[in-house]
């Protein structure tokens, strides 16, 4: 269970808890694969690092354009 950053703080960065979960998971996988971490924290845990990156605004997301039937 994460205590810091709080879920309330993290929810200000995204539009839903599902987006948050997906964003952190994808970034954690990138870190496991060898990407360089963007924050300087003591933890070596990829999920903790990814969560801190999202909280600091270093990792963002973009929703794809919605296409409808015309």
Swiss-Prot record:
Catalytic activity: RNA(n) + a ribonucleoside 5'-triphosphate = RNA(n+1) + diphosphate
Enzyme Commission numbers on file: 2.7.7.6
Any GO BP annotation: DNA-templated transcription
Keyword line: DNA-directed RNA polymerase, Nucleotidyltransferase, Transcription, Transferase
Pfam families assigned to the protein according to its UniProt record, in alphabetical order: RNA_pol_Rpb6 (PF01192)
UniProt signal peptide: none
Top-level class of the enzyme under EC nomenclature: transferase
GO molecular function, one term: DNA binding
Superkingdom of origin: Bacteria
A Gene Ontology term for the protein's cellular component: DNA-directed RNA polymerase complex
The keyword NADP belongs to this UniProt entry's keyword annotation: no
Family per similarity comment: Belongs to the RNA polymerase subunit omega family.
Subunit structure: The RNAP catalytic core consists of 2 alpha, 1 beta, 1 beta' and 1 omega subunit. When a sigma factor is associated with the core the holoenzyme is formed, which can initiate transcription.
Protein role: Promotes RNA polymerase assembly. Latches the N- and C-terminal regions of the beta' subunit thereby facilitating its interaction with the beta and alpha subunits.
Matches recorded under NCBIfam families: rpoZ
The protein's name in its UniProt record: DNA-directed RNA polymerase subunit omega
Source organism per UniProt: Thermoanaerobacter sp. (strain X514)
Gene assigned in the entry: rpoZ
